UniProtKB/Swiss-Prot annotation:
Predominant location: cytoplasm
Gene field: accA
EC number annotated for this UniProt entry: 2.1.3.15
Family named by the database record: Belongs to the AccA family.
Annotated protein name in UniProt: Acetyl-coenzyme A carboxylase carboxyl transferase subunit alpha
Organism this protein belongs to: Clostridium acetobutylicum (strain ATCC 824 / DSM 792 / JCM 1419 / IAM 19013 / LMG 5710 / NBRC 13948 / NRRL B-527 / VKM B-1787 / 2291 / W)
Classification via Pfam families: ACCA (PF03255)
BP GO annotations: fatty acid biosynthetic process; malonyl-CoA biosynthetic process
Keyword Lipid biosynthesis: yes
Alphabetized InterPro entries for the sequence: Acetyl_CoA_COase_a_su, ClpP/crotonase-like_dom_sf, COA_CT_C
Length: 274
């Protein structure tokens, strides 16, 4: 494997998709204490593609939610390959609202190729569930931090990433759709996926440059699986500083900053001389 500074977007995507890539539950176990997982959306059922609950961090209670993939075929079937259904997003929203009620900071780990697009998910209101999360997260009166730890795919990722600060691990990706999908739609040729990955600007460094994310967390060469403790320690230190800073910010200022952060994404200024 090349030095991390020399990796192409496609190589980073390959690392992000590795079965060995550390999952949300692994980071939760290393970063937080006394994690207690909650289940169910109180409307339809539970979704194992999203895990969440209450934990202790730096002596304070926090709410932690993460999209969860599996390590093998059986686990991935149970977790639906990390593609959440409507009940998963509604479970996440239940935990977000509970965090707000008890004034607990919220930390989200994003790792999904996208929301589940099966017929049953559409029948249960997948679009509505995602949209409800977007508007609700924008208005949460608590500090919110989201970290893309693997794949950040489309609205399925954004539904857990409307946050005061959005971070990415160095070899994670965040995009509207997959390079394979992009190539199929734009060029009618999915074999040009590597080329699409270059064009789409899906890497942490690219997105940091565009102001879409706020921080890039370094990984060891070859990916986080080669030293998850190093990555977890870096996340812990950065979370401590960020939560302290956000907790000292007034609610109105917090909400205004969050709103303005997302309003700036995609903004451009035309040159009046041309």
């Amino acid at each position: 494997m090349e030095n991390s500074q020399e990796l192409t977007p496609w190589q980073r995507l390959t690392i992000a998709r590795m079965l060995e890539r550390p999952t949300s539950l692994e980071y939760i176990d290393l970063i937080f204490d006394s994690f207690m997982e909650f289940h169910g959306d109180r409307a339809f059922g539970d979704d194992a593609a999203i895990v969440g609950g209450v934990a202790e961090f730096n002596g304070m209670p926090v709410t932690v939610i993460g999209q969860q993939k599996g390590r093998n075929t059986n686990e991935n079937i149970k977790r639906n390959f990390g593609m959440p259904s409507p009940e998963g997003y509604r479970k996440a929203l239940r935990l977000m609202k509970q965090a707000e009620k008890f004034n607990r900071p919220l930390i989200c780990f994003v790792d999904t190729s996208g929301a589940y697009c099966g017929v049953e998910a559409e029948q249960r209101g997948q679009g509505e569930a995602i949209a409800k999360n977007l508007i609700s997260m924008a208005n949460l009166k608590i500090p919110v931090i989201s970290v893309v730890i693997g794949e950040g795919g489309s609205g399925g990722a954004l539904a857990m990433a409307v946050a005061d600060e959005v971070w990415m691990l160095e070899n994670s990706v965040y995009s509207l759709l997959s390079p394979e999908g992009f190539a199929s739609i734009l060029w009618k040729d999915s074999s040009r996926a590597k080329e699409a990955a270059e064009v789409m600007k899906i890497t942490a460094d690219d997105l940091k440059g565009y102001g879409i994310i706020d921080k890039v967390i370094k990984e060891p060469d070859g990916g986080a699986q080669n030293d998850i403790t190093m990555v977890a320690n870096a996340l812990r230190e950065n979370l401590k500083k960020a939560i302290e800073g956000l907790s000292s910010t007034g609610i109105n200022e917090l909400l205004d900053n969050r709103y303005n952060k997302f309003r700036q994404i995609g903004k451009f200024i035309e040159n009046e001389d041309n």
